[in-house]
Amino acid sequence: MQSIQAEFYHYRYLVLFSLCWFALNYAAALSFGAPLLIFADFVKYYSYVLMQYVALCAMALVYIALRALWRKQNAVKTVRQAVCQYVQEERYAALLPILIAMFGIFSCVSMSKSLVQYINPYQWDMYFYEMDIWLHGGVLPHEILLSLTPLNEFSTLMILKLSYMFWFFMMIIAYWYVIFIDGNRVHRDRFLWASSICWVILGGFSALYFSSVGPVFWHDF
């Protein structure tokens, strides 16, 4: 337990950064008259913190068991020792404060995008549309892609949708590696702060300034 308390103290500024980002979104919602129902998504998303915490701990134990089997060791005994040492192992004890901070930031980024329509109504879609045409030689990028594949349009779009979702798994793997495998606190802190700042600036403020609904929903606006 002392190790977990020590990790909360170590990551206190990251947790505070997350709380400040939430407070800024809350103040913006009140100032611009946004419905407080927007915060329901935040509560729903943030309620998954404990579940994700348990899931990632389970992933860590699976990794430990597989590593033991690879080294021809007793996997059950190795996992039992890992569980006993959990609260003393700095990498694992750090997971709870990291999840609280990072999931707060992720939730607030999602919430800030819902506030765009109230703070800075969508206005950049035409510019992005013209930029796409200019960058791709006078045609839209999806037209080039559809001309290169033997599949029909629906199948191609489904493949693209699945490919797009792959970024989420890449992100989870990156965080999992930094927290559990790297073991270098300096690398971990640097990665967490860099990713947090990128989420807030690129996913929050940039999305607010360059407000656009995207090509899929543009016709609805």
PLM features: residue spans?
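Terminal transmembrane helix and immediately flanking juxtamembrane interfaces
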Residues: 1-221
